[in-house]
Amino acid sequence: MSFILVLCTVSSLFVGGGTGIFLYKKVSKKYIGDAKELAIRIVEEARKEGQAQKKEILLQGQNEIFNQKKEFEFDFKQREKELSIKDKKLQVQSERLEERLERAAEKEHEILKVEKELSIKERNLLTLEEQLKSRIDEQEKQLQKISGLTVEEAKQSLFEEVKNRSRHESAKMMRLIEAEAVETANRKAKEIIANAIQRYAGDYVSEHTVTAVTLPSEDMKGRIIGREGRNIRALESATGVDFIIDDTPETVVLSAYSPMRRQVAKMALERLIQDGRIHPARIEEIVRKCEEDLAIQVREIGEQATFDIGVYGIHPELIRILGQLNYRTSYTQNVLRHSIEVASLCGMMAAELGVDIKKAKRAGLLHDIGKAVDHEVEGSHAIIGAELAKKFNETEEIVHAIEAHHEEKGKPETALAILVQASDCLSGARPGARLELLESYVKRLEHLENIAGEFEGVSKAYAIQAGREVRVMVDADSIGDDQTYLLCKDIAGRIEESLTYPGQIRVTVIREHRAVGYAK
């Protein structure tokens, strides 16, 4: 039983092993076959893909070669065209050069021909010159034999005869031309001047050395005088103007040769009357304000004068100085009005003569600018004015017209300067325009003030009481009481030496020392 079982078991094992081996071989063959087929297929596909890529690469290479070939052919054609164009240009230039060479050769041939002709003519001329020279020598010898004079003597005689004849003729012609020119110039000048005078119609008021201020009541006179006269003394000291309070009802007369001082005094007095507070400290404050306001008015007056005449571009400082002329007089004639009149006359006459009208008006307006500062600077007003104009960038033509209008630095050399001189004479020579007596009086007062101002330590000097008194303000820090007395004597002595005058002149030297303290 067990043997059979064992036998069956062994048989089963053999049968199972054989079956397994058979099945294994069969399956292995199948797998191997599949793998071979797969490998063959992969190889085939790889071969096909490689061929496709090869074709694609070949195609791309062919395309690139084709494109490069096209580009090369295009570039070649372009360069061929450019070379063709350049070749044509070179041909044209070559043809032109050939033409030029031909023309140059022709000209050279012509020049050679002309040179030959000239050389022939030169030889002929030399021959003729020699013939003429020999003939002239023969004739000179014959003339010397006939006249008994040498060549030099004959030349000198002929020259003297021609010179005398020419001189006589030219002198005769010059006399005729000069007479004609003088007659024409005089007639034309009279026409131009008459024209200008008729066209100008400026108003004129004679200037005086006094100004009247109307008071609201008679009581105001006492307030102006103040206790023991301190207010009126403060007014006269601050303004340099003589305040005359007399029996004239409700009127105070201000007397001073300087119109600017009178104007400051008038403005200050009117403001004090309106304000009501009249005492020395207030007087000084108001006078300072009035001086500042007058400086503004002076500039405005100068600007208005330039606007009225139509002159622009003048330096602001010259405009300010021009405004000061409104407060200066020359033989009672207001200098600013005189300058405006001269500018107008200059412009009118310049238009007749064809001279620059704007320059003529400018020179006429500025011709007396030096009179605004001639009391501060030594010298003639014409020379001072020329220096001012030059300082503030006026042209040489304007400067010359200013300095030459009184011929102090030579005669006028330009038409503009002559116009200014003529217009100045016309404006000043009108009947009633100027009064000699008042001008000499004003100059005497100016001289008095200048004498006092020459001394060291003098701050201000005023000539008042019609020149019968000089009030001198000195600096308290630089001059003591004893020196004040000596200064007074020195000024009086200098006036006696320098001036001739009737009666006597009182010299008052004022030294004021102030001490100011504040209670806190």
UniProtKB/Swiss-Prot annotation:
<dbReference type="Pfam" id="PF00013">
    <property type="entry name" value="KH_1"/>
</dbReference>
<dbReference type="InterPro" id="IPR004087">
    <property type="entry name" value="KH_dom"/>
</dbReference>
<keyword id="KW-0255">Endonuclease</keyword>
<dbReference type="GO" id="GO:0004521">
    <property type="term" value="F:RNA endonuclease activity"/>
</dbReference>
<feature type="transmembrane region" description="Helical">
    <location>
        <begin position="3"/>
        <end position="23"/>
    </location>
</feature>
<comment type="similarity">
    <text>Belongs to the RNase Y family.</text>
</comment>
<keyword id="KW-0694">RNA-binding</keyword>
<dbReference type="InterPro" id="IPR006675">
    <property type="entry name" value="HDIG_dom"/>
</dbReference>
<dbReference type="InterPro" id="IPR003607">
    <property type="entry name" value="HD/PDEase_dom"/>
</dbReference>
<dbReference type="InterPro" id="IPR017705">
    <property type="entry name" value="Ribonuclease_Y"/>
</dbReference>
<dbReference type="GO" id="GO:0003723">
    <property type="term" value="F:RNA binding"/>
</dbReference>
<comment type="function">
    <text>Endoribonuclease that initiates mRNA decay.</text>
</comment>
<dbReference type="InterPro" id="IPR004088">
    <property type="entry name" value="KH_dom_type_1"/>
</dbReference>
<keyword id="KW-0378">Hydrolase</keyword>
<feature type="domain" description="KH">
    <location>
        <begin position="209"/>
        <end position="272"/>
    </location>
</feature>
<dbReference type="Pfam" id="PF01966">
    <property type="entry name" value="HD"/>
</dbReference>
<feature type="domain" description="HD">
    <location>
        <begin position="335"/>
        <end position="429"/>
    </location>
</feature>
<keyword id="KW-1003">Cell membrane</keyword>
<keyword id="KW-0472">Membrane</keyword>
<keyword id="KW-0812">Transmembrane</keyword>
<keyword id="KW-0540">Nuclease</keyword>
<protein>
    <recommendedName>
        <fullName>Ribonuclease Y</fullName>
        <ecNumber>3.1.-.-</ecNumber>
    </recommendedName>
</protein>
<dbReference type="InterPro" id="IPR036612">
    <property type="entry name" value="KH_dom_type_1_sf"/>
</dbReference>
<dbReference type="GO" id="GO:0005886">
    <property type="term" value="C:plasma membrane"/>
</dbReference>
<keyword id="KW-1133">Transmembrane helix</keyword>
<dbReference type="GO" id="GO:0006402">
    <property type="term" value="P:mRNA catabolic process"/>
</dbReference>
<dbReference type="InterPro" id="IPR022711">
    <property type="entry name" value="RNase_Y_N"/>
</dbReference>
<dbReference type="InterPro" id="IPR006674">
    <property type="entry name" value="HD_domain"/>
</dbReference>
<dbReference type="Pfam" id="PF12072">
    <property type="entry name" value="RNase_Y_N"/>
</dbReference>
